[in-house]
Amino acid sequence: MSSNQQPVVLGKLGSCHGIKGWLRITAYTDSVEGIFDYSPWLIKENGEWREVKVTQWRYQGKAVVAELEGVNTREQAQMLTNCEIAILPEQMDALPEDEFYWRDLIGCEVVNTTGYNMGIVDQIVETGSNDVLLVKANAKDSFGKVERMIPFVPEQFIKTVDVQGKQILVDWDPDF
C-alpha cells in the first residue's frame, strides 16, 4: 500500500471521561468538531487498524468527548487511550485541481530554479506566520546541508507544486 493509500490520521483518543466508556478526543483537524464530519473512523489498536463508529459526542468544558459504538465501560475505554484516529484517504474531500493536502507534499523532491536538487520533503511545520517545509538534503549535498527549512510562501518561494510528478520548484538559495 502506498503512502497515499495509508489511513490519514486525524486525531487521537485521550483519557476516559466518566464510567460509561466515553473518551476525550484530540483532533488534528482545523476545527475540533471537524473530526466528527468523518465516519467511520479507523482506530489503531495494537498496531492494527479497525473500524469504529461514533454514536454521540459533545463538548465537556473546553474538551470534546465521544461515545464509540461497543465501548460501554470505563475499562473498555481505557484500552483505547492514546490510540490514533484515522480515516481512509477516499473519505477526504476532493480538492480543486490547483489545491492539495499537506500529506501529498511529503516525499516530494524539491528543486530550485537553477535546477539544483535540494532534497525530499520530510515534514511540514506550522508556524505563526506561514508553514515551513522541512527538506532532508541528499547524502552528497554540495553545500554540506543535512536539512533545509523552506517557508511555504506561494509565488515568493514556492513557484510550482506538481503533486502527480512529486516535485516542488522553489526560488531558494541552496546555501541557506
Swiss-Prot record:
GO cellular component: cytoplasm; ribosome
Entry's localization field: Cytoplasm
Keywords of this entry: Chaperone, Cytoplasm, Ribosome biogenesis, rRNA processing
Annotated PRC barrel domain residues: 97-176
GO molecular function, one term: ribosome binding
InterPro entries: PRC_barrel-like_sf (IPR011033), PRC_RimM (IPR056792), RimM (IPR011961), RimM_N (IPR002676), RimM_N_sf (IPR036976), Transl_B-barrel_sf (IPR009000)
Quaternary assembly: Binds ribosomal protein uS19.
Domain statement: The PRC barrel domain binds ribosomal protein uS19.
Family: Belongs to the RimM family.
Stored NCBIfam families: 16S_RimM
Protein name per its UniProtKB record: Ribosome maturation factor RimM
